């Protein structure tokens, strides 16, 4: 009986760790997206167009090599 209780507590702790890991990852992704959109907002639309064009050229040139 005692071994089963210990095993259940270990399983609960593992489940808790897994849930906390997912929560931390979601929070980090959310903060990253907020930072990206904030940077995009500060750059403005014309800057984003230039960056997108440069990035497209870079990707195309990388694929041609």
UniProtKB/Swiss-Prot annotation:
The chain crosses the membrane at residues 19-39. Induction: By acid stress, via the EvgS/EvgA system. Residues 1-18 are cytoplasmic. The keyword Plastid does not apply. It is found in: Cell inner membrane. Keywords: Cell inner membrane, Cell membrane, Membrane, Signal-anchor, Stress response, Transmembrane, Transmembrane helix. It is a single-pass type II membrane protein. InterPro entries: SafA. Residues 40-65 are periplasmic. One of its GO terms (cellular component) is plasma membrane. Its main location: membrane. Connects the signal transduction between the two-component systems EvgS/EvgA and PhoQ/PhoP, by directly interacting with PhoQ and thus activating the PhoQ/PhoP system, in response to acid stress conditions. Interacts with PhoQ. Belongs to the SafA family. This is Two-component-system connector protein SafA. It comes from Shigella dysenteriae serotype 1 (strain Sd197).
